[in-house]
Each structure stands twice: as C-alpha cells, then as structure tokens.
C-alpha cells in the first residue's frame, strides 16, 4: 500500500515540475508516463488481491470505477499535452502555450489527488464495508430496489407480529428509494424538451402521491390492503421509467441533431465576429442547454449499461466536457494574440473529439429498434400536422433528425449484422437514399408542393418501419440460435428500451484505441489504460 502512495507522490512531483518549469517538453511528459505506468501496474496487482472481480460490489465498485475514471482522464490529458507540446515546437523560439498547459496539468493534478483518496477509501472499505449511500446509486439501481421491495408486498403472506419492526424499516427504505428516484427524474426534467416537461411533472406527482398513500396506510392496513396499494405504486414507477425512456430519446434526437445550432464552431465564429449581444447571448444559451442535455444523456446511459468500460468512457467524456465548459467560452472571447488562438484551437479540437467519442459510445449502447421507433413516432406526428409545420421550417428539422439514425448505422457494431442480411442491406441503402432526398427537397429555396413532400416522408416512414422489422427478425434469430432462456425475476422482466439488451457486458472500443476488440471483463480495463500510455509515449 505504501508503495502505491510513494509512486503516486512521484507522479505528482513530476506534474508539479511541469507546472513550474514552462520549458518542459516531451522528455518530461515521457518521464511522467513512465512513472504513472509503474503506478498503474502496481495498482493492478493490488486490485486483484483487494477486490477480486466477483467481489466488485457496493462501495468497492464505486471506488474502483472512480479510479478507472481518473486513469482515463489522465490519459486523455496526456494526449492533449503531447499535442500542445508538438504545436509549441512549430512556434517562434521560446513561445509557450501556458494557459493550455495549465488547463490540462490542473486536471491531471486533480485526478492524482482523487486517485490517492480513492485508493485509501478502497483499502478502508476492504477492511470494514459500509452501506452504499442512496446518492451514489443510479436511477436504474434505485428503480430495481424499489420494485423488488414492492414485489414482496404484492405477495399475500400471513401477518407475523415479530416482523412488524422489519416491515416498518423496509417501508422507510422504500420511500427513500422513491424520493431519490424523483430527484434523478427532476434533474432530467430540468433539461427535457418543453413538450415532455408537463407529462413528466404529472407522472412525478402520481408516483409521489401513490408512495405517500402507501406509506401513510402501511401500519394500519393488513397484507391484503398493502398488496392493493403496492399494485397501484408499481405501474406508476413503470410509467416513470417508460416515459423517461421516451423523453431521453427525444433529447437524443434534439441534442445530437442540433449540432449546427449549438455547435462549438459556430459559437467560436460568433464570438470572434463580435455580433450583437442578443445573438451572442442566444447562442450561448443554446450551447449551455445542449451541454446540460448531453450531461443528462450520459448520466442515464451510464445507468442503463452494465459494462464497466462503457461507463468509464462515458464518464470521462462528461468530465472532459464539464471541464471545458468552464473555460472554452473565455478562450474564444480572448483571441487577441496568435498564442490565444492556438489555445482556443486546442480546446475546440479537444471538445469536438470528446463529443464524437461520446456520440459513438451512446450509439453503441442504444437499442436500434427503440431508436427507430422513436423517430417513426416523430415522423408520423409530422406527417399528420404537415400543413402547419411546413411553413415554419419544422419539417426540414424532422428530416435532419434522421441523420441520427444514419449515424447510428454508420458504426460497425450496429451495421455489421444488418448489412450481412440481404434484405437489411437493401433497406439500409433505400433509407439513406430517401433520407437525403427528403432533406434535399426541403432545403431548396423554391416552394415545393406539400403533397410531394408528404409523399417522400411517407416513403421514409415505410422504409424505416421495414428496417425496424428486419432488426427485430435478426434479434429473434440470434436468440433462437443461442437458445436463450427467458428471465423470471420481476426486475429482469423489465427491458430498458434505451439500452440494447444484446450488448451484455462487452462493447466495441468507441475509437479510444486502434483496436476494435471488446473487453470481456473488468480487470482488462487497467490493461487497456496501460496500453494507451505505452501507445502515447
């Protein structure tokens, strides 16, 4: 244990040397990489003893996942520092990008301090485990706990006086689970589309009302009455999950399609051109909302996936975007020198890179059928209201939202099986063709007969519906070939429509390395991180 701390202190000393010596170059960065590689190697051996793979539960799992996040962030910042140093080599003698270096060095320093705290907490937890705080549980984990507890009340059992105190404790726990569920949901509602906020609010009120009734009457009601009230609360929780799924997809189509309206490139151009304060404020507001929405998409994506590598990549992307969000606008506003412009270039490149990785990993875990279904709903509503929407330009936005489906099937993990199927390959090609045709006819400046536009949108709808059916068929055939058995427990019967149930515990690399192989278990994640360090150096 002491050796880990000593090695981590050595890493911190090297980073501090880079912060005070502004002429530190690649040799200094390689020195840090070597020291950090040694620490990571020692930690890997230590982790196997401290927390075997099958014992990564509770707070131990939380601390290990925090350590994985810090590893990934350190590696990300190393990559950006290497790029910064290489750019400095092309500048005039002695020119240094101090603001850029400071940004990434501060992030590495924070990660090293967090690593030290997490390693200590991990050791303490291995000696004497502590209960996991509800604040540390995800929406899905809280929902599973709440439904499992309700399941016990749905079964009528003879009353037992000796269990009264246990029952009282359990109802308190159930109420706490529901309250924390609502906290997660409210955070999501703050950035949800206006069209979803009203429905979400109504569902929250229903859940809280049913939970309050169940708690209020718990002690006075017999098991039969408790069962009836449990059966009322269960569907309210299912409704909450279902509508959050749908609202999450709506957010994905809006935030991932709306890259031009709130793009980092457009924001920089507007700030550089010194446009009116109203235009700047509007774009800044759009940008901030989009970043907040991406954060919520990431939080729920983490909740819906079980793969530790996927969670780590998403967390790292969110951490990078959050860190950049605080400094990228000032960097764009202060481009008064060539060095300031280089600083803005590096931050913009980093932001776009993290956003691309984030988008790809989200597409990796999304269920293709659920994504198509959501877009079909958007298309159907738009076709029904085409006369009102066409003059406002909304039909063009709807057609452009189809790019999210296009991007989804550009990834090998999502199209490999589809294009291997003759019908699937043909329908995918037809989808791409009609999508581009719909966008083209809506983008031209001359007026086009609305009937022609509706006809194309209906063709797009028909092709997508058939494509979804092919995806259904492929999933069914795979299930039959694998001789999959149906699950029986109450929580496993729920299928989270956001995440692809076929992913299991592996996922493609999402462009973090050149390899496309998936990691099959959690201990491989550290090896993955070490490979990244060796690749960089």
Curated annotation (Swiss-Prot):
Subcellular location: Cytoplasm; Cell membrane
GO BP: any one term: cellularization
Entry superkingdom: Eukaryota
Function, in words: Required for the cellularization of the syncytial blastoderm embryo. Involved in the localization of the actin filaments just prior to and during plasma membrane invagination. Sry-alpha together with nullo and bnk may provide auxiliary functions, by acting both to stabilize a large and dynamic microfilament structure and regulate its functions.
Chief localization: cytoplasm
Keywords, alphabetical: Cell membrane, Cytoplasm, Developmental protein, Membrane
GO cellular component entries: adherens junction; catenin complex; cleavage furrow; cytosol
Pfam families: Serendipity_A
Name listed for the protein in its UniProt record: Serendipity locus protein alpha
Membrane-related topology note: Peripheral membrane protein
Lineage, broadest ranks: Eukaryota, Metazoa, Ecdysozoa, Arthropoda, Hexapoda
InterPro entries documented for this protein: Serendipity_A
Listed GO MF terms: actin filament binding; beta-catenin binding
């Amino acid at each position: 244990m002491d050796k880990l701390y000593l090695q981590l202190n050595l890493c911190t000393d090297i980073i501090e040397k880079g912060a005070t010596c502004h002429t530190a170059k690649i040799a200094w960065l390689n020195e840090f990489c070597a020291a950090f590689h040694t620490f990571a190697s020692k930690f890997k051996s230590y982790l196997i003893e401290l927390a075997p793979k099958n014992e990564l539960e509770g707070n131990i799992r939380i601390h290990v996942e925090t350590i994985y996040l810090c590893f990934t962030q350190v590696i990300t910042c190393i990559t950006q520092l290497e790029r910064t140093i290489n750019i400095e080599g092309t500048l005039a003698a002695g020119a240094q990008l101090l603001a850029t270096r400071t940004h990434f060095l501060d992030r590495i320093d924070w990660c090293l301090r967090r690593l030290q705290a997490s390693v200590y907490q991990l050791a303490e937890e291995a000696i004497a485990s502590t209960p996991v705080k509800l604040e540390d549980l995800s929406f899905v984990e809280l929902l599973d706990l709440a439904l499992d507890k309700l399941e016990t009340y749905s079964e009528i059992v003879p009353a037992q006086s000796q269990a009264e105190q246990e029952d009282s404790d359990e109802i308190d726990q159930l109420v706490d689970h529901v309250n924390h569920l609502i906290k997660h949901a409210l955070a999501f509602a703050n950035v949800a589309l206006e069209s979803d906020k009203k429905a979400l609010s109504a569902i929250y009120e229903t859940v809280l009302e049913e939970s309050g009734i169940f708690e209020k009457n718990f002690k006075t009601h017999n098991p039969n009455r408790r069962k009836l009230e449990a059966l009322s609360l269960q569907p309210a929780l299912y409704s909450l999950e279902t509508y959050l799924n749908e609202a999450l997809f709506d957010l994905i189509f809006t935030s991932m399609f709306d890259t031009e309206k709130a793009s980092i490139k457009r924001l920089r151009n507007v700030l550089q051109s010194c446009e009116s304060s109203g235009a700047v404020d509007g774009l800044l507001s759009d940008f901030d909302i989009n970043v907040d929405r991406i954060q919520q998409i990431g939080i729920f994506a983490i909740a819906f996936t079980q793969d530790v590598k996927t969670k780590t990549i998403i967390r790292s992307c969110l951490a990078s975007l959050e860190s950049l969000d605080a400094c990228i606008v000032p960097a764009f506003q202060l481009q008064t020198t060539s060095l300031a412009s280089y600083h803005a270039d590096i931050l913009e490149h980093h932001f776009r890179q993290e956003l691309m990785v984030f988008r790809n990993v989200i597409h990796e875990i999304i269920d293709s059928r659920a994504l198509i279904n959501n877009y079909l709903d958007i298309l159907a509503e738009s076709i029904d209201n085409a006369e009102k929407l066409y003059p406002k330009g909304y039909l063009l936005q709807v057609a452009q939202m189809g790019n999210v489906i296009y991007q989804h099937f550009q990834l090998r993990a999502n199209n490999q099986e589809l294009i291997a199927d003759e019908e699937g390959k043909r329908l995918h090609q037809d989808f791409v063709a009609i999508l581009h045709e719909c966008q083209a006819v809506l983008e031209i400046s001359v007026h086009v007969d609305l009937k022609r536009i509706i006809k194309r949108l209906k063709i797009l709808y028909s092709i997508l519906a058939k494509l979804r059916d092919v995806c259904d068929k492929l999933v069914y055939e795979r299930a039959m070939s694998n001789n999959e058995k149906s699950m029986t427990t109450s929580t496993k019967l729920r299928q989270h429509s956001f995440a692809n149930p076929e992913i299991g515990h592996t996922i493609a690399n999402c462009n973090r390395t050149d390899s496309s192989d998936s990691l099959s278990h959690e201990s491989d994640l550290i090896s993955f991180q070490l490979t990244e360090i060796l690749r960089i150096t």
